[in-house]
Swiss-Prot record:
It comes from Pseudomonas aeruginosa (strain LESB58). This is Potassium-transporting ATPase KdpC subunit. Belongs to the KdpC family. The system is composed of three essential subunits: KdpA, KdpB and KdpC. One of its GO terms (molecular function) is ATP binding. It is found in: Cell inner membrane. The gene is kdpC. Disulfide bonds: none annotated. GO terms for cellular component: plasma membrane. It holds the Pfam family KdpC. It is a single-pass membrane protein. Keywords: ATP-binding, Cell inner membrane, Cell membrane, Ion transport, Membrane, Nucleotide-binding, Potassium, Potassium transport, Transmembrane, Transmembrane helix, Transport. Part of the high-affinity ATP-driven potassium transport (or Kdp) system, which catalyzes the hydrolysis of ATP coupled with the electrogenic transport of potassium into the cytoplasm. This subunit acts as a catalytic chaperone that increases the ATP-binding affinity of the ATP-hydrolyzing subunit KdpB by the formation of a transient KdpB/KdpC/ATP ternary complex.
Length: 183
């Protein structure tokens, strides 16, 4: 019996060291060398180096002077990130969308873009389509006392056009740039 147990324990120990220690350290080392920013969470910092957030996780922005992210079913908490899981026929979904649309609606701007009233699959999507950011530009410019053209140009300069997929605007990066503007 011990003849069979010894090789099994040796295999367990060796495989545990390889898969639990050596491989993770190797992958972490390669990631730190090849992609240091991404390996450390794609963090966004202010001028003093203070971490304000990650490019990968949405944050809640209250107030008329900020661009708003997509709604979050989990109130932007990473621990409880999830979709709302409400069926299209659920009255609670219709009520929430109507409430969010009323909050985001800007006179004479047409219908509120869908991205501003619907949650993403994770509830933490940090990006908006450019048209959703442009829709908010008038509200933000008015609240901050800035020329609309300046705010629209800021949205355009923060529009990312990936090789594959639609153009997007990272709301945290956009709001950081907005905070740096003189009123």
């Amino acid at each position: 019996m011990f003849k069979q147990l010894r090789p099994a324990l040796a295999s367990l120990l060796v495989l545990s060291m390889v898969t639990g220690v050596a491989y993770p350290l190797l992958v972490t080392g390669i990631a730190q060398l090849a992609f240091p920013e991404q390996a450390n969470g794609s963090l966004l910092r202010d001028a003093e180096g203070k971490v304000l957030g990650s490019r990968l996780i949405a944050q809640k922005f209250d107030g008329e002077e900020w661009f708003h992210s997509r709604p979050s079913a989990g109130d932007y908490a990473t621990v409880s990130s999830a979709a709302s899981n409400l069926a299209p026929s659920n009255p609670a979904l219709a009520e929430r969308i109507a409430r969010d649309a009323a909050q985001e609606r800007i006179a004479d701007q047409g219908p509120v873009p869908l991205a501003l009233v619907t949650t993403s699959g994770s509830g933490l999507d940090p990006q908006l389509p450019p048209q959703a950011a442009r829709y908010q530009a008038l509200r933000v410019a008015t609240a901050r006392g800035l020329p609309l053209r300046l705010v629209e140009d800021l949205v355009e300069s923060h529009t990312e056009r990936p090789l594959v997929g639609p153009a997007v605007v990272n709301v945290l990066a956009l709001n950081m740039a907005l905070a740096g503007l003189k009123r």
